[in-house]
Amino acid sequence: MNRVSRVVPAVAVATLLLSACGSSDSPEPAPSTTGNSTASASTSQSSSTATIYNLPGSGVFPEGITAADDTFYVTSTSDGAVFRGTVGSPDVSVFLPGGADGRTGAAGIDVTDDDDRPDYLMIAGGATGKVWVYDANSGDLVATFTNGLGTDATFLNDVAIADNGDAFVTDSRSPALYRIPFDQIVAGTQDAPLETFVSFDGTPFAYGEGFNANGIVENDNESALIVVQSSTGNLYRIDKTSKEVTQVDLGGATLMNGDGMEMDDDTLYVVRNRDGLIAKVDLDDDGRTGSVTGEITDASFAYPTTVAAVDDRLLVVNSQFDKRGGEPVEPFTVSSVPE
């Protein structure tokens, strides 16, 4: 997603992932007490450069994040809740309650960021095989889509809204990339079948054991979609016109455990969840070649999954997926670090 404040976040329910895996100009929010439906942001420990946003609730295990302007949204894999916060403000609250509209789990999330279009929030539903579309301001349900596959055959992991308004959804289990045309979203379609945009069968993008297609973004010149394969660390380019699938040439580098991604101008940020870092990739405008130019990490990172760019900072979800079934540190958090 090539814009200043978006995410592609990417993603998976924690146990499945493990098997395969604020604006710099904004004031730092002050600490405040966490409540049942609202939590706060605080300045991180001296060993960290991050500002920390606390998520309300217990057992959240967050995954996806997206942002438009200074508003950000975070998903919960545990019950499908979606939280909303404002960069520079201490309060993060429940925007969409868990379980509503059959949303029992939520993974990747994206939001439109175009003054000429309505503000839509799109949520990939993991093993449910569903995608939900909401009004990003009111929280009203707009449309729903499904691939009709069983929970053992699909995992809708991440979603990216392209510049033309169409949405693209990755599936970590089934070798397909889905497209949701913008006109179907506007029409308020309910339980519509997901359209397979590209089947990866017979292409260089070979599915194997573990998690496959994960994070997705639109490239800088909007000619293609870029998808990371978690299990191999390979990056793939899907041409939006010809639908040709090719591997991005990273000069021999790989992005193992690649999860959520964010495109900010010509810099691609790739979260490598198990490795606790974000890789910076200088990607050419056409998305065919790139080079890993650096890494970002912070003491506050705790199995990071997805990232959203807001001005000169990155909002990073700390999923603690490695603590599922154990003792996670609560509250769950989002870190805001410099790019």
Region spans (language model):
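A short helix->beta-strand "capping" segment at the edge of beta-propeller domains
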Residues: 41-59, 290-294, 337-338
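Conserved beta-strand positions in repeat-built beta-propeller and related beta-rich domains
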Residues: 73-79, 114, 118-127, 167-173, ...
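Hydrophobic alpha-helical segments and helix pairs
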Residues: 133-196
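Bacterial N-terminal signal peptides that target proteins for export
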Residues: 1-10
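Beta-rich, blade/repeat-based domains predominating
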Residues: 56-71, 100-122, 148-167, 202-224, ...
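Short loop/turn segments that connect beta-strands within beta-propeller blades
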Residues: 86-90, 135-140, 181-185, 239-244, ...
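Short, low-complexity, disordered segments immediately C-terminal to signal peptides
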Residues: 12-16, 21-46
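Blade-level signature of beta-propeller repeat domains, shared across WD40, Kelch, NHL, RCC1
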Residues: 306-339
